[in-house]
C-alpha cells in the first residue's frame, strides 16, 4: 500500500530551515494529528470530543505515542509546531515566565502586567538537536502609587517596559523517546476519601536561560529596585515542559 503523505501543506523541508526558523503562519495541527493517528492505529479519533474527557485525553496520548513509533519524523515536527503556535498565542507552558512568584505576593502593588510574545524562532534537526530564541515584552501599567525598597516609587498612570530574551536548547543527555508519552493514574487517601490524580504528559527535557532588560532609561534604572530583581537573569539546566498542553490549546 502506498504510504500517505501527511503534513504536506507545511512544506517541512523549507518550514523548519528557511532562514533558520519555523514559519509562524501554519495551520492544520488538529487535522494532521488526526491523520497521523489514523495512519498509525487505523482509528479515526474525533479529537475535539476526546480532548474534553479524561479517557479521551489518555487515548490521544497513547495514540500519539503509537504515531511516534510508526512515523517519528512527522510526529516530531507536528509536536514542535504545536509548541511554536501555542507559545506565539500566549500559551507559554513555562510557569516562571508568568512571574507569579514575584507579582502575586505584592497584592498592595497597584499595577496590571501585560505580556506579549514578540517572536519565537526555532532551529530544528530532531528532538535531541533543537534551539529556540524568543523575545517577550512585559508592560507594568500602574494605576496606584507604590513605594518600594531602594527608594523606588511608581505613580498612577506610570509604565515600566521590559524585554525578556529567552534561549532554549535540547537537553544534552535526556532523550525524547516513546517513554516520553506518559499517562498515570495515582490513587491516594485524603481525609478518609479516596482521590485519584490523572496525569497526561508528553515530556520534553530541555535547558533554558533568559535575561530581562528595561526598554527605556526609567525601566532600566528601576529593574533592580522592584520585585523583578530576582528575574533579571534566570537559567535552568534541568527543565521539563509538557508538549500535550500545547496540543490541548490548539485542539478545538
Swiss-Prot record:
Cell compartments where the protein resides: Cell membrane
Keyword Ubl conjugation among record annotations: no
Membrane topology: Lipid-anchor
CC terms in the record's Gene Ontology section: plasma membrane
Coiled coil: none
One Pfam family recorded for the sequence: Lipoprotein_3
Keywords recorded for this protein, A-Z: Cell membrane, Lipoprotein, Membrane, Palmitate, Signal
Protein's name according to its UniProt entry: Uncharacterized lipoprotein MPN_411
